[in-house]
């Protein structure tokens, strides 16, 4: 895990606040990237220059029109009006240029073309979050390993994976030995356990499922991602089992057992979990995981997500998710800025899983993974998981992807 400290976001200042350990680590990373600068041409020819875009990089606290130069698969320069040539040029005038998006909750490895579809939408790193359990994990591992972009997967604690009748309604399916064996066999790809705890998935077994998940990962120093929302057990019982580095996805799920009470207060167990380093993730999804009134109340209470994710599936592209930029767009009319959104889709998720530790930034020397977005004004109907509609005045659209310094064609 990249960090055991949670990112705390101030709803007033709207800036990312990192703790001392993260600051020292970030400073060391900057020094490391600085050592690359001598390897790049200063005014000669680069491999690729993305010219004239509004470059937003929360890791650098950068928001301004810049030219972005790439050489040898890495960021070589970020400058105003760069006086240099390049083998290839992208005209990004009128567009937003950001680090490649990192989606930590997808089901991209359920389909062979899933990684490529994500990549064309600007997602240059993803986690497949529990599409399969130990019995059927080989296909997920193979698709994840073959992805062009950095990708990893979580094994579902239910050994048969996602089931219509509920992954762990039969508690014997939460097989500690089988999941641990899968993790140990595929340590290069499997980076944690997914535990779905909703009442239609685990029933009254939710506490025991989470306890077993921790039994699996704790000796391996790996995280658990919990799928919360409408659990049988109260969060006051479940959340004390969460350790630093674990992830709570579907944080905007409505009652029963939401993270916010009827009086608009975030539950104390939720606040305590964040303080000890648990990450809170959007996990948009298709069914039951996000409702506009809960989003509004939670954000008004000052409890902002650490990370955005889609819970992406091929089927979800025709429903409320569509793509990662669309999910981000839904939060613009809740008082979050474009910079707020980009931070939670780039630098913040880069801290959650070690595979992304050098991503989520456009610092010189970093891998040249870039998403180009277009922010279009207009009237857009955004749908939650309950078919409620909110009309927004702006939407982000994917307009280009660069992975390792190479252009990726749009799907």
Regions picked out by a protein language model, each given a short descriptive name:
Residues 53, 367-411:
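C-terminal cap of metal-dependent C-N hydrolases
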Residues 293-377:
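His/Asp/Glu-enriched, well-ordered alpha-helical/loop segment
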Residues 32, 38-49, 55-99:
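Histidine-rich, glycine-flanked metal-binding segment
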């Amino acid at each position: 895990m990249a960090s055991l400290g949670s990112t705390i976001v101030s709803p007033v200042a709207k800036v990312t606040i990192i703790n001392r350990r993260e600051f020292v680590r970030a400073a060391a990373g900057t020094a490391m990237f600085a050592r690359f600068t001598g390897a790049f041409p200063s005014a000669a020819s680069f491999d690729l220059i993305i010219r004239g875009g509004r470059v937003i990089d929360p890791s650098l606290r950068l928001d301004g029109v810049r030219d972005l130069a790439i050489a040898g698969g890495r960021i070589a320069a970020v400058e105003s009006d760069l006086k240099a040539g390049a083998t290839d040029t992208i005209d990004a005038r009128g567009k937003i240029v950001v680090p490649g998006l990192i989606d930590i909750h997808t089901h991209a490895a359920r389909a062979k073309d899933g990684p490529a579809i994500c990549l064309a939408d600007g997602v240059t790193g993803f986690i497949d979050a529990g599409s399969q359990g130990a019995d059927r994990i080989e296909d997920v591992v193979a698709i994840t390993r073959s992805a062009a972009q950095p990708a990893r997967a979580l094994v579902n604690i239910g050994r048969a994976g996602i089931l219509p009748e509920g992954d762990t309604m039969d508690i014997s399916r939460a097989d500690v030995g089988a999941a641990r064996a899968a993790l140990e066999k595929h340590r290069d790809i499997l980076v944690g356990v997914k535990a779905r705890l909703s009442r239609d998935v685990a029933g009254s077994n939710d506490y025991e499922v989470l306890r077993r998940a921790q039994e699996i990962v704790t000796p391996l120093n790996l995280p658990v991602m919990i799928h919360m929302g409408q659990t049988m057990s109260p969060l006051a019982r479940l959340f004390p089992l969460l350790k630093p580095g674990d992830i709570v996805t579907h944080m905007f799920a409505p009652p029963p057992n939401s993270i916010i009470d009827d009086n608009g207060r975030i539950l104390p167990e939720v606040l305590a979990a964040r303080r000890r380093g648990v990450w809170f993730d959007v996990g948009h999804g298709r069914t039951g995981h996000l409702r506009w009134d809960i989003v509004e109340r939670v954000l008004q209470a000052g409890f902002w997500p650490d990370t955005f994710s889609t819970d992406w599936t091929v089927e979800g592209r025709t429903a409320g998710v569509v793509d990662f930029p669309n999910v981000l767009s839904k939060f613009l009319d809740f008082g979050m800025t474009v910079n707020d959104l980009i931070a939670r889709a780039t630098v913040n998720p880069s801290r959650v899983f070690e595979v992304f530790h050098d991503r989520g930034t456009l610092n010189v020397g970093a891998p040249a993974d870039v998403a180009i977005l277009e922010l279009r004004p207009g009237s857009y109907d955004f749908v939650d998981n309950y078919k409620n509609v909110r009309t927004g005045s702006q939407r982000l659209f994917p307009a280009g992807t660069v992975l390792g310094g190479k252009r990726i064609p749009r799907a």
